[in-house]
Amino acid sequence: PRNHSSAASDVYKRQQVGCVVNCSFCATGKQGFSRNLTLSEIIGQVLIAENSFRSIDNPKEKNITNVVMMGMGEPLLNFDNVVNAMQIMRHHSAYNLSKRKVTLSTSGLIPEINKLSKVTDVSLTISLHAPNDKLRDILVPINKKYPIKDLLKSVKNYVDSFDDKRITTFEYILIDKVNDSLEIANELANLLKNYPCKINLIPFNEFSLSEYSKPSNNRLRAFKEYLVKKGFITTIRSTRGDDIMAACGQLVGEVKDKTKRKERLKRQVKALELNA
């Protein structure tokens, strides 16, 4: 996606074909995992975006100003290629992007987060989506291996390893009547009250085979306003690409039903009985 309101351009890049994390609100995991992208494929996405932007604006300018490792796949599962790509993008002979202009988003792989501070100092975004382990185990299954308490400790260690004052962004997909109540907003505020952070709310983007729904604008605004009153910098991400099923959580080649064959047959039989 591109920010059309200025000359600045944000590039969201994918790092894998498919995804093994399999968050329940994301279409990407439904297609399974194929492979990691190579270093050249990751950098190639930036070059393609740059050429596209040049055709719109000044053809001689490099106007890519922000790169976010937040597309299809979990960046930290393609650790070496992603780190090398970020280093290239920050090099003065390439895009000369500062550490604050390159962001890595992760679902919370603690060992890789712990390694990250030794090789880079880019901005970190955490796909949180729930304030407690019971709910996050459902939404982000990797939480069963890396629970919230341990994840936040790892994030704090990453931030504290640098001298500058920086904040962590926590991404939070809002799903209707799943994680969007004011009670949950209060729980989220209590969880993050000791962390310098920004909370980025993302309305759920619906896709085929999903059992979830997008929250109403009223519930979305109420959730945000509650967090703001609690003192948090809170934003609502503008949905882009949903008209072509390419918004956050919709990136997929073909949504395939990965349900076990036995369960699929049961559903098919039930459907036939209802239609009989």
Predicted region positions:
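Single conserved hydrophobic/aromatic residue that forms the stacking wall/gate
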Residues: 1-8, 12
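Local cysteine-cluster metal-coordination motifs and their immediate loop/turn environment
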Residues: 14-30
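Flexible, glycine/proline-enriched loop segments at strand-loop-helix junctions
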Residues: 28-37, 72-74, 100-101
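Conserved alpha-helical substructure of the radical SAM core
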Residues: 30-66
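Short beta->alpha linker loops
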Residues: 37, 108, 239-243
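Conserved AdoMet/S-adenosylmethionine-binding subsite of the radical SAM
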Residues: 51-57, 63-230
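A structural preference for short, hydrophobic beta-strand core positions in alpha/beta folds
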Residues: 201, 236-238
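Radical SAM enzyme core and accessory elements
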Residues: 241-276
